[in-house]
């Protein structure tokens, strides 16, 4: 039974699941990471493809320090559990150059830099004598020359065991079975053992068992020899279990003796019998699966757990140090070692002053001056630090300059948005609807009403005119629209309105007026069809008498020889005041013009 192969896209999806953004503090999904390392170790995906998938994930998360940290944690788990073929790909130039760039990058977090440098140091200590992995030594020496601190790493005894993960052996090709030496034919086919990689016939390779130490948890084909080896390991693990049970019974007896000694001591001291005596609970031995009885697997698990505990202790100590300090930053601040001390500054100033003095002296004096030579050696040692400080200052200046340009762009955008909003507000106020109480037209609104066209009756109501209304009324009274009305009707209306105004003794109290928006069509129709209102400036001293209306049956038109005195001096044709009778029996009304006084317009 062959193992199912895995595609690169599926492997990328598993990597994203292990390094999910929702996992805080740069942690990983440990169960998914171990499953991923088992897939690499069982060669369901070629080691080179697995290495390139991890490198691609590192380059994708370059701008996110949290995800970058989780990806490198996953790389560490795969390195220590993926086997030697994957380690060879990790220690190649293609992957180690990426690791070196992450360590030397200025934007790398301090904690991430320390973690990656620790990975390089562990690889160096484990494989510095291996000729196939010699590129790790070159990267280590290059980082040390660049000033990366590698002195904290100490060689441990179990360092080689951390990278010693058992992997399936390479398949061997042969023409005969490696147990019975039977030649393979068309009917007797050959089969490979997934544990040792040998070639066997169907008779000697018919067993199927899982291989958890190789990262294979599904039953696969093994030969008879490998099956017997796994069977012996299971039996030996059962014997260890029985010994563990005996030791457990001895520990229970010791607890019982301790309990009795406590009871006797309490009785001797005169304590009451009701005193609480702690009862030791009997622990049941845990049942372990036979797959977990492999000593190599146990050693690998213990090493990984021990490393995980050390990592947790280190993180807790860093968290305590972070909370004890007054700085609110999450990561510890990077110490700037480029600052010059006071002694170095004094040496530089002293060297400069001595050089100025030596300009006037002969060259032999310069060579004989030992103090100048010593200062020269000191200044040469300070020169790299000055260069680093200068480059650091330039990089900070560029960063601040970019931030300042971004802020200025944002402020310009914000100002343009504010100007646009203010412009919209001014336009909305400019084109707003005028007040409903204000009359946009200059016509006099107090128009008389008629009940019937044949018998006109004027209902005059008391009004209080303001100066503005009087001025507007005067101007409207002289408009060309009002001149289309007949002279007799104008005189009659004016006389009746003045008579009603004289009859009222006093003006009533003003009533609230409801303002409505005027209609242009209705006002024009009222001005043409209806009679105009009374003039606002009558003569108080002159009393106008009502003229006598004479019925003239001969002519329906008013006298043409009489000239009316109006505000303007234009003469317009007159219109019949009433409908002409057919038989000529009706009498016509003869009206006499009344002399009106010219109105004064206030300027």
Curated annotation (Swiss-Prot):
Residues 20-151 form the VHS domain. Residues 253-272, 292-311 form the UIM domain. Zn(2+) 2 binds at residues 193, 196, 223, 226. One of its GO terms (biological process) is protein targeting to vacuole. GO terms for cellular component: endosome membrane; ESCRT-0 complex. SUPFAM superfamilies: ENTH/VHS domain, FYVE/PHD zinc finger. Residues 273-294, 320-339, 496-561 are annotated as: Disordered. Its main location: membrane. The keyword Cytoplasm does not apply. It holds the Pfam family Vps27_GAT-like. Residues 320-329 have a biased composition (Polar residues). Residues 281-294, 547-561 have a biased composition (Basic and acidic residues). Zn(2+) 1 binds at residues 177, 180, 201, 204. A zinc finger (FYVE-type) spans 171-231. Gene3D superfamilies: 1.20.5.1940, 1.25.40.90, 6.10.140.100, Zinc/RING finger domain, C3HC4 (zinc finger). Component of the ESCRT-0 complex composed of HSE1 and VPS27. Component of the ESCRT-0 complex which is the sorting receptor for ubiquitinated cargo proteins at the multivesicular body (MVB) and recruits ESCRT-I to the MVB outer membrane. The FYVE domain is involved in the binding to phosphatidylinositol 3-phosphate (PtdIns(3)P) which is required for the association to endosomal membranes. This is Vacuolar protein sorting-associated protein 27. It comes from Kluyveromyces lactis (strain ATCC 8585 / CBS 2359 / DSM 70799 / NBRC 1267 / NRRL Y-1140 / WM37) (Yeast). The gene is VPS27.
